């Protein structure tokens, strides 16, 4: 993409309404614009990051055997009355009436709807286990939305729902999502630690939050320091091998890790002092097993192998992609701007033409741009007339992981400058070497 043809409304001044780093940088980088309190338009740069996050989530969900569908944002209030949760959300739930005076609502979550869908379609244990997921916008009318997309009223959510004949099968489904989440966050360049968590209004008796450590985190968390050195599950993990999946879960839950609500000071104190970690954390995922909490009021049953009816055992598994964008920025930035993990950066490579109009520089940039694009690399080519300092600032602000600086002085020696955003390192290489390094 040529920057001269792209929509990138950069803000050079720090927005006064932004209280935290991610909100400031997302506004300055032209990723989002606020349309009303807690509601944001995702501009092209922000949408590219959001889509890359969603693609990784999809790939890892599909790897487990989960099946994607899409449920509506508007739900019938009758479903929520049937589950008994219609009043639980209070004013957080935005309630509306259609032209026929029927009570409707903007869905804050989808346990009721997915249970109703499965109730009407699954009658036998032979159709289980089943895991259905979707990625959809949700709305919760927060009293005080703040911090940009980190805590907004409208947000994008991946929620998955598992259905099993019994508690044993449901535990395996839970474990599969546990492992999938470890892989998902690792692929995004994040070290997410699973922590025993409170179930809240979702309900159930088993829950883990996946937390990334950040000084700006909203809550205090406590864990063993060895978690930071643990390797994620491999790509070839067999999700059908219940024993192998259970072993991964055991490895990641044996050491102490808990959110503030579930913290046990005595257990934490037993950890060697040099391995104790008390820090701020950001929740990036949350999984629940809640048994028959929803299948019971909906009478969602299947015939078992014994010929008797059995209530379906369920779990739910959430990741907020829009919130995750902000969390990544909170965890990885510097004074110049965003430092994206390579896998989710809006563009992998930036080509900076430092003297537009110079025939040799223009030709070298055009050649690199054509070759890298043909190789499938996401490239942003800054072909604008801005001064060099402004181009450097923009590339660092939006977090381009690799930057190729093409100017007449270095090009006269047959070289371009290759810069790595994460550490600021630079080296002179030939254009051909730059291409070989970055072609993937």
From Swiss-Prot:
GO terms for cellular component: cytosol. Keywords: Aminoacyl-tRNA synthetase, ATP-binding, Cytoplasm, Ligase, Nucleotide-binding, Protein biosynthesis. It comes from the Bacteria. Homodimer. One of its GO terms (biological process) is prolyl-tRNA aminoacylation. It is found in: Cytoplasm. It holds the Pfam family HGTP_anticodon. The keyword Iron does not apply. Catalyzes the attachment of proline to tRNA(Pro) in a two-step reaction: proline is first activated by ATP to form Pro-AMP and then transferred to the acceptor end of tRNA(Pro). It catalyses: tRNA(Pro) + L-proline + ATP = L-prolyl-tRNA(Pro) + AMP + diphosphate. This is Proline--tRNA ligase. InterPro entries: aa-tRNA-synt_IIb, aa-tRNA-synth_II, aa-tRNA-synth_II/BPL/LPL, Anticodon-bd, Anticodon-bd_dom_sf, Pro-tRNA-ligase_IIa, Pro-tRNA-synth_IIa_bac-type, Pro-tRNA_synthetase. One of its GO terms (molecular function) is proline-tRNA ligase activity.
